[in-house]
Regions:
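N-terminal export signals
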Residues: 6-26
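Extracytoplasmic beta-sandwich strand-turn segments characteristic of Greek-key/jelly-roll folds
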Residues: 60, 65-67, 89-123, 203-205, ...
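Hydrophobic or amphipathic alpha-helical targeting/insertion segments
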Residues: 117, 121-150
Length: 346
């Protein structure tokens, strides 16, 4: 571990202050980025109060990191927080020493220090990165961002759309309810839920899509506890083509469910069908985003990827039943409220 000042003196890293790749080695395909964790302010919607958050490079979500399959990614991580941190590369089949697990695979990056992550990306898919010390607080405050590995360099030329979702527990002034961070009641039950939903760091954004052709939507749930459920428009069907960064045998559905940290890629055959994205996990339909067509068409997307690994035989599989009960009171089926019994299960 080295200090920020010494690191800059030795490497000249002070010249590179954004998360945009600042050089590419043609022989080794090294994509270089710099991420700085610090306190920052962010507006979830125009003309509203700015919220105090902890962010990478002052962005919510953090900057998009892109690479091609078999590239090497090099990230200079600078910690400008008042407490230690580290960065985990969620879903990447990584080198153990670069996986970002404090104490186990690396020392904590102390305030004012820097750490260089350098690892190959072996798989194309949808991934993300996030703080990995006190994640229940640091990730909740905004320290995360998307990481997309492509099979080619045509990511920006395609109807390839990121849908990064998070829920935030905010007060009437749009400030975080920091008093609830680390709440043991939440931990022992279903976790700390938020009361406001963002897509790509914004309340109910307009998402641009090409006016015709296919579209790939990359869904990513960065909430720390909430299981999210999405549908498009009024229940139109689409194809799931990848889960957790790996292509799958495509199948049709009209809703997707994402647990915390989960990613699902879907394919829409015709973007003219896209109107609204709705979150429906509570039983109510909440419009999370609106799709806005732009006058450009796109050719057929290349999504016919085979799963990376063959499906194992289940002939001699050992069956293990896992009961997902949701923590304390997870088995509660009903309760009496105001003298009336209310059922919790349909």
């Amino acid at each position: 571990m080295i200090s920020r000042r010494k690191f800059i003196q030795n490497t000249g890293a002070g010249l590179f202050l954004t998360a945009i790749p600042y050089s590419t080695n043609a022989l080794n395909n090294i994509k270089k980025y710099e991420l700085t964790a610090k306190k920052a302010k962010h507006s979830f919607e125009k003309n509203q109060n700015k919220t105090d958050l902890w962010l990478f490079n002052n962005n919510c979500p953090g900057p998009l990191i892109t690479a091609n399959k078999n590239d090497v990614i090099e990230i200079i991580f600078n910690n400008q927080l008042d407490e230690p941190s580290a960065v985990h590369w969620h879903g990447i089949r990584n080198i153990n020493s670069m996986d970002g697990v404090p104490v186990l695979s690396q020392p904590l990056v102390e305030p004012g220090e820097s750490f260089v992550y350098r690892f190959p990306v072996k798989d194309a898919g949808t991934f993300w990165y996030h703080a990995h010390n006190k994640a229940w607080e640091q990730v909740t405050r905004g320290l995360y961002g998307p990481l997309i590995v492509s099979d080619n360099d045509q990511l920006k030329e395609k109807n390839d759309i990121l849908v990064l979702a998070d829920d935030w527990l905010l007060n009437e002034n749009l400030q975080m309810d920091v008093s609830s961070l680390g709440n043991l009641h939440d931990w022992s039950h279903a976790g700390r839920y938020g009361n406001r939903l963002t897509i790509n760091g914004v309340f109910k954004p307009n998402i641009e899509v090409f006016s015709s052709g296919q579209a790939r939507l990359r869904f990513l749930n960065t909430a720390n506890a909430r299981v999210l459920k999405f549908m498009l428009n009024d229940d139109i069907y689409f194809r799931v083509i990848a889960t957790d960064g790996s292509p799958c045998n495509p199948f049709k559905t009209n809703k997707i469910v994402l647990g915390p940290g989960q990613r699902i890629d879907i394919l829409i055959d015709e973007t003219t069908k896209l109107k609204h994205l709705k979150e429906v996990s509570t039983g109510n339909e909440l419009v999370a985003a609106t799709f806005e067509p732009k006058n450009q068409s796109v050719s057929v997307l290349d999504f016919n990827k085979k799963p990376y690994y063959p499906f194992p035989s289940l002939n001699n599989a050992k069956v293990i039943n896992i009961h997902m009960q949701g923590g304390a009171m997870g088995n509660l089926k009903s309760a009496i409220f105001n003298g009336e019994r209310r059922e919790f299960r349909n």
